[in-house]
Every structure is written in C-alpha cells, then in structure tokens.
C-alpha cells in the first residue's frame, strides 16, 4: 500500500511524548517502593490495633470475672449478715432491758447505710491507688449479671482493676510465671460443663402426665421444661428394672435424688425416655447414664431403629443388626471456651502433681476459677421413670437377630449382610471376609452357659471376679456384695461392704492383683480401699479428690498405683502405698468414663464424654495420642498382647483401633449404647454389653461374632476371670449373672 522506501515523518508537536524502557522501570520501581511503604505503615497500624484489641479483651475478661466474683461475694456477705442478725436476735433477749434497747438501737443504726457513705468509703479506697496507676476503663456490665449491688460495683471494680495494674507493675518479672499459673488453674474451671452421675432411676414410668416436668441440661440451651420428647434431654442411656408394687411419683426416685448416668448424645423418637439434669445441685451440669430401659429395647436415639427386636434369630456369625448413624457433637459454648486455657503436663510420673489454691488472671489478679463459668444457668432436675421391656429368655447358642434395614447394608460373598467393616487409612469402608479359623482354634470359646444368678437387689453398675474365681463382687446402691460362687446351689452374699453414702451408686470396683484389697468408687468424691484379708472386711484407707464422682478405676500391674476417671474429666493418679494423690492428667473437656492400661503399665487409655479417646505416657506424664469420634465413649479395653484398642460407643458401634497404624474395624451388632467391654487375658477375644440387653463375644481384631446372649434388661457391666473360664455381668434388673465359657 505504501512504497517501501518511504522516509519516516518527523515527530509533530501534537504527538505524545514516548518514555524509554529505563524510565518506565524507574517509575515502576518508585511506585512499588511507595506502595511498599504504605503497606508497611498499614501493617504497623494493623498490629497496633490488634494489640489494642487484645488489651481491651484482657481488660474485658478481667472485668467480667471480677464482676462475677463481686456478685458472689455480695451474696456471701448478705448471707453472713442474715446469720449474724439471727444470732443477735437470739442473744438480745438474754441482756438486761436497758442493754437490750441500746443494742437494738445500735443494730438499727448499723443497718442504715446511705449511698453517700458508700461513695465516701469507695473514694477512700481509690485515693491511695490514684498515685500509682490510673483505673482501667470499664465496659458496660455484661447481660446476665445480677444487679443487686449495682451502687458501688463499677467503682469498686475500677479500684480492683487499678490495684491489679499496680501489682502487675511491681511484679513484672513474675508475669510469665503467673500467666502460666493462670492457665493451669483455670483449666479445671471448664468442668462447669461435665457432670457426674448422681443416682439411678429405678421405677417404671406410669401412663399419664407425670413425666412432663423433665428438663434438659445442655450447654447451649436455657433452663426450663420442654414440651416434646424430641426437645427433652438427649443424654439417654437407660436400663429397666423390676417393677415396684406401687409406682412412686414420677417427680422423685426412691432415694429422692436425680438420675445418674453416662450420657447418650441423641434424642429419642417414639419413646418416653429422657434424662433429667442435676444442675440444681452443687455438682456441675448433669450429663449422666440413666440406668433404666426403654420399652421393647428401643434404642435411645432417633437415628437408631426404634422397632422392637425380633425374637427370630438367624444362626451364624455373619448375620447383622442395623447400623446406627453417628450423632454429631454440638460445638462447645463460646463463653466457656473463651475463658479457659489449655493445660500442659510435663512433670515425670513419680513427681507429685501440685496445683495452687487460686487462679491468676493474666498474671495480674487472683480470681477463683469457679467464677469463670457461672453464666451457665442451673436447671432444676427431676427423675424420670420408664416402662420396661418384656423378659427375654437366656440364649446360650450363637444367634443374631435380623434387622429391618439389613437389606441396605453391604454384603459379604456369602450373601448375608455384613456387621464387621474394615476402615482403611483413607477412610474406605469394606465388609470383612472372616478367615476359616475365625470361630475355631485354641482359646476361642464356642458359647457361654449361665451358671449362677446373683440377686443383688439393686441395679448392678459394677462387677469383678477374683483371680481364684471363688468370689464375685457386685456393686449397687451404697454397697458392694461379696458372693461365693465356688459352691453350687442358691446364692446369698457372704459379705456386704457398705461404701460411699447409702443412696449413692457404686460405679467401679477393682481387685488388687493379690486379691487382698478392693478399691471402690462411685457417686462420691471418695474412693474406699477395703482390706479383704482381715477376719471381717474393713475400710483401711480412703482417697478423696475434688471431683464429685468417679466413673471408672484401673490398677497398675505392680499394684502400686490406682487411676480414677473423674466426672470433671480429670484422671487422678493415686499412690496406694502412701494413700496420696501424685498426679492429675487433664485433657478431657467432659467426664472421663472408661480406662485401661497397656504396654505393661506404661501407657494409659481413657475415653470420655467429650467424644475422645486419649493415650497418656505414664513415665513422661504427657498425652501421646488423641482419637476423635462423633459419639460419646462409654467403654474401652486394650488387647493384652496386641496393638488393638476396642471402644464401645453411645452410637451402638464397637470400633477396634490399631494404636500404631491408621486403620480400624467397625462392628455393628449392638442395637443401642455399648456400656461395658472387656478383653480376655489371652487377647484372642473380648466381650461387650449394651443397653439392648445383649452380651456379645467378638474375635480380635476383626470382630467375628463368637456367641451372643440375651438378658432381660440392659447389661451395664462385665468382667472376665483371669483364666478366661467365667464371665460375670451386672444388669438393670437388680442382679448379676455368672456364665461359664464353654470351649
């Protein structure tokens, strides 16, 4: 279009100026440096604001805790004044008439304290502090604080805050130590959430409106009655008992106390069962195990099949019951989480574990740790009564009941629905094809035969059998009964060991390896150590902890140390020789419900109502592992000679975890909560019991069903003799059963 020899036209005055590449690079560099300077300035400003925010949060938390402390102190002083006034009223009549008038006038003058006098007193307290540090600016009073002493609360809070600042300035070099102390001391305060069991519900629920006053203890819900079964407590784990001649009022249990329990985190459908809480008592929020059964063994869950179990059974270990969905655990309360710090334990196993008597707030101000979570509203607790299921005959032969949803489950090559699944490291779940020797071989039982029935008379929450298999110990309400099972014939207890209080249930009893001592724990802060070698069994020592209840016990192989699972989530380590507490393992954020020892006494496994299983190193005094689940943990046991840990859950599943590899097995034969679990000493099999009245025997680790026995009520506890020849169970129909294992 244009000739190739065309000369370039000169630049006209109206054309834009052209930058060189170097100039453009310099311009970009200048702009980048400018933006970088702006970014640095904004970053410093952001860090400054974050620091100010942290400081304001610290001041707010300080004021928040002080307000609660002052409120408690106000009520305390009011109660003191009330009591002193009563004492004065009792003493004044003994004075002469003249002195009576003088004293009465003096008392009346003392009661007339004006607002001006209060302000003057507070001003006198503030005056010496004003020379050292200005008072901390205070935020408005949080909603929910009682305003009974509102006149001088803010001013007094300012005085305390100023005093705290002064203390911080004087003791600046100790701030780190005090802050650490604050974390150590405030960690136990999170136990306003978990709660211990208090008593067992023992009656049946009469038809009528009697059960309408039940309430729910949940950290996210306000107190008050609920209108429907689905809104009532989802902490349900129930066992039936014999019906009394006259059903008592549904408002109270026979002992007048609230129900106790390890909780189930699921709501009920088509069932009257629900759990009452015990927040009205001095104990923390009740999340408990109600030992009462549902009609027709209805699982305590809306996700489980609520139809009654079928009597028809299908022989063979490959039949299955239905799967229950795992219940998701609700998130913890924001308020309670914001005011607690984690606890680290690093002292050696033999070192005494000491805790101070007060907590510090950010190293500045001592505040009782109990003030932290007082925003949780107490709920008045009431007991509930339930209908019982029809009595089922004992079945010693292997049987597995059909399930209404079995057709939807994966199947094994034999064509029957599977109940055992292997879960790989990547979460893939596959049915387990059992090996040909799953149910045969040395040390594998064929079935169990009922040998003795021990009529304890109360719900049997704990059982153990002696090493000689001569005696069985059953724990119920307020006592442990000793039975001689070495002789045939009708059984009557040969001794009764009265423990705890008469109305408190025994939750665990453990024999020392020599069989000469028995340790008993339950719904009390005290553990009892019984001397069984004496002519008459007697208490030779008592161990007292700060927790209101003990859920489970374990004894070290050398019998020198005892471990107790407490309702506040702590694991207390006791020196049995000196009868002293030597350590506390703190990590569970809810009650610790079960415990076992592994690796020749060097590791401890605990399960909790916080949906976690934790492993502790007893030599180093620290937590090694933590396994999280979507269901509460009710029972566990470690295989004596293999690296497998069996866990029984509220969701009705039994999971077999490999403690060194990311693999596990899931077993789905139970139809409701798995309440107890025990390995045979050979490690080749174990048993589990549940609220579905079943005793299941499983092959380690893949869970082939060896045999299954049906009782007439929920089976709460179990034990296996040291020689693996006997199994003893405790149930909700006030009896224990001794089985002979047939090989």
Curated annotation (Swiss-Prot):
Residues 298-322 have a biased composition (Polar residues). The keyword Nucleotide-binding does not apply. It holds the Pfam family WD40. WD repeats lie at residues 455-493, 501-540, 545-584, 587-626, 669-708, 710-742. A motif (Nuclear localization signal) lies at residues 214-217. Residues 1-127 are annotated as: Q domain. The modification Phosphothreonine is found at residue 253. One of its GO terms (cellular component) is extracellular space. Disulfide bonds: none annotated. Residues 179-188 have a biased composition (Basic and acidic residues). The keyword Oxidoreductase does not apply. Transcriptional corepressor that binds to a number of transcription factors. Inhibits the transcriptional activation mediated by CTNNB1 and TCF family members in Wnt signaling. The effects of full-length TLE family members may be modulated by association with dominant-negative AES. Belongs to the WD repeat Groucho/TLE family. This is Transducin-like enhancer protein 2. The lineage of its organism: Eukaryota, Metazoa, Chordata, Craniata, Vertebrata.
């Amino acid at each position: 279009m244009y000739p190739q020899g065309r000369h370039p036209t000169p630049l006209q005055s109206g054309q834009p100026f052209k930058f060189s590449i170097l100039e453009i690079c310099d311009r970009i560099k200048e702009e980048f440096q400018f933006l970088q300077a702006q970014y640095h300035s904004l970053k410093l400003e952001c860090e400054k604001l974050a620091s100010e925010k942290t400081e304001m949060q610290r001041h707010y938390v300080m004021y928040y805790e002080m307000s609660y402390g002052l409120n408690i102190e106000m009520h305390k002083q009011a109660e003191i004044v009330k009591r002193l006034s009563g004492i004065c009223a009792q003493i004044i009549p003994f004075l002469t008439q003249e002195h009576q008038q003088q004293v009465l006038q003096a008392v009346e003058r003392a009661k007339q304290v004006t607002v001006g006098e209060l302000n003057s007193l507070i001003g006198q307290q503030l005056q010496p502090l004003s020379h050292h540090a200005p008072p901390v600016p205070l935020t408005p009073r949080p909603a929910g604080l009682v305003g009974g002493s509102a006149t001088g609360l803010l001013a007094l809070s300012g005085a305390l805050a100023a005093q705290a600042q002064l203390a911080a300035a004087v003791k600046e070099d100790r701030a780190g130590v005090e802050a650490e102390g604050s974390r150590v001391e405030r960690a136990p305060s999170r136990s306003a959430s978990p709660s211990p069991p208090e008593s067992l519900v023992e009656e049946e629920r009469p038809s009528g409106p009697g059960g309408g006053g039940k309430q729910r203890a949940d950290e996210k819900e306000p107190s008050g009655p609920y209108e429907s079964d689905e809104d009532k407590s989802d902490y349900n784990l129930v066992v039936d008992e014999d019906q009394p001649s006259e059903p008592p009022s549904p408002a109270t249990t026979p002992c007048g106390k609230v129900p106790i329990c390890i909780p189930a985190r699921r709501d009920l459908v088509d069932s009257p069962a629900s759990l009452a809480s015990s927040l009205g008592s001095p104990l923390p929020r009740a999340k408990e195990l109600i030992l009462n059964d549902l009609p027709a063994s209805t699982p305590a869950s809306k996700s489980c099949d609520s139809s009654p179990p079928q009597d028809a059974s299908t022989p063979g270990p490959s039949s299955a019951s239905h799967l229950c969905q795992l219940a998701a655990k609700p998130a913890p309360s924001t308020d309670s989480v914001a005011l607690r710090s984690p606890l680290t334990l690093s002292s050696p196993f033999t070192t005494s574990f000491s805790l101070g008597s007060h907590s510090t707030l950010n190293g500045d101000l001592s505040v009782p740790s109990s003030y932290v979570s007082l925003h949780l509203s107490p709920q008045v607790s009431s007991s509930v009564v339930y209908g019982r299921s029809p009595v089922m005959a004992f079945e010693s032969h292997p049987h597995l009941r059909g399930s209404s949803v079995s057709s939807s489950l994966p199947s094994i090559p034999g064509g029957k629905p599977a109940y055992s699944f292997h879960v790989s490291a990547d979460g893939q779940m596959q049915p387990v094809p059992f090996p040909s020797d799953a149910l045969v071989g040395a040390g594998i039982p064929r079935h169990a035969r009922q040998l003795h029935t021990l009529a304890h008379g109360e719900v049997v929450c704990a059982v153990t059998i002696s090493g000689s298999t001569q005696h069985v110990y059953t724990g119920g309400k307020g006592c442990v009964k000793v039975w001689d099972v070495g002789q045939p014939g009708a059984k009557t207890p040969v001794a009764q060991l009265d423990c705890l209080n008469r109305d408190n249930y025994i939750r665990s009893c453990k024999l020392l390896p020599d069989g000469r001592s028995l340790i008993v724990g339950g719904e009390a802060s005290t553990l009892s150590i019984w001397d069984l070698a004496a002519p008459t069994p007697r208490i030779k020592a008592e161990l007292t902890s700060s927790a209101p209840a003990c859920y489970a016990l374990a004894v070290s192989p050398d019998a020198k140390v005892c471990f107790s699972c407490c309702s506040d989530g702590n694991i207390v380590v006791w020196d049995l020789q000196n009868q002293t507490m030597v350590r506390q393992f703190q990590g569970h954020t809810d009650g610790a419900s079960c415990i076992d020892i592994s690796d020749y006494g060097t590791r401890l496994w605990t399960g909790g109502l916080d949906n976690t299983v934790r492993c502790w190193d007893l030599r180093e005094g620290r937590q090694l592992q933590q396994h999280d689940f979507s269901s509460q943990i009710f029972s566990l046991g470690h295989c004596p000679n293999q690296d497998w840990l069996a866990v029984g859950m509220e969701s009705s599943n039994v999971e077999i975890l490999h403690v060194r590899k990311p693999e596990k097995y899931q077993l789905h034969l139970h139809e409701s909560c798995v309440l107890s679990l025990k390995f045979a000493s050979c490690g080749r099999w174990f048993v589990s019991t549940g609220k579905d009245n079943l005793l299941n025997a499983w092959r380690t680790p893949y869970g082939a069903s060896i045999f299954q026995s049906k009782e007439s009520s929920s089976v709460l506890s179990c034990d296996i003799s040291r020689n693996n020849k006997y199994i003893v169970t405790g149930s909700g129909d006030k009896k224990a059963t001794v089985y002979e294992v047939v090989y």
